[in-house]
């Protein structure tokens, strides 16, 4: 990808007004497809392709693909992993997320006084979440994106929209600032880290930008 252009929505046959353009650059002599610039920001990486800085955050890594810390100058997040390489905790000293797994599937997350329990179908698609003792149900599209969270009456209390790469465009609904903000399962059912806007895919981290 050399550039990404965003146009206003239209039903016409030709694109509407151009709203934004993001340019990508690749300049590494040893690794031709390694991203070195994004939207005017310089990106640096280590020898195995882990990002070290993106113009906003700086990153440190352990044991290959395990993100150890990330810092934006004022806040540092530190991650902890279990023996299987699954992330079990991330904290910045004042806010702490704790994660529990059933096999490789996230089964429980706690942040502050809020605890969420997750259930999946046989294919691994998220089905339901219990949030502070109340059951809610996920609505997903054909590629597994969580597009809404429903209460037991079938009313959508949270709705998410994404771009084609998983960047969250909107979070709406009567519980957008509570359940909508705390729920980590978003695009393709991946675990979303709100503070960094990265998705945690266990074997790697994914930046939708």
Positions of the model-derived regions?
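Beta-turn initiation residues at beta-strand->coil junctions
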Residues: 3-10, 35-41, 52-57, 69-74, ...
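Residue-level signal for glycine
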Residues: 15-20, 73, 85, 93, ...
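A motif-centric feature for acidic-aromatic and gly/ser/thr-rich catalytic loops and repeats
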Residues: 24-28, 131-202
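Trp/Tyr-centric glycan-recognition "aromatic platform" motifs on solvent-exposed beta-strand/loop surfaces
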Residues: 119-131
